Amino acid sequence: MSLYLPEGFIIKTEDNIKYLSSFENFKEAFKKGVPLEARASSCDKEHNLHIDFGFIEGIIPRGECAVGIDEGTTRDIAIIARVNKPVKFIITDIKEIDGKLTAILSRKILQNRFYQLKLPESKVGDIIDAAVTHLENFGVFCDIGSGINALLPIDNISVSRIPHPNVRFSVGEKIKVIIKNIDE
């Protein structure tokens, strides 16, 4: 189900393109609660993400950008880093702001659904889709669904010793991973 795929996996799908092609289709996605994906075009000084759909402006308010932002467990850099990258969201409202129609979006709702619905049914040994988001000397950070990150340690990447994860992976690469353990 596209709800649980990593960000970037549905941006070019037929359904996503259809729902983002016109205001009428966009409203249909709103009514149905369909998860959509588009590139964040900017981040303002309040750390709200903006998406320009052409026919309407979209805003993901700071607190709706990621799980943990309001609590302080997720840093604002996690929001800023999404600029010019695909973000998955649902439309929570369409209203007039400063004289123009604006779509209010939420990424956090989809992340909460992932934690509440997908993670509990996942088990060690499951093979899942992931997208490489960041490379470090000690491993690869991957989006495992709706912007939720997981670590693939360097010692689990290859049977032979490698000097850095960039020998095997690059940022943005779509991969399959096996769940080794799940932190509570």
Go through the PLM ranges and name each one.
Residues M1-E184:
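Single-stranded RNA-binding regions, centering on S1/OB-family and related RNA-binding modules
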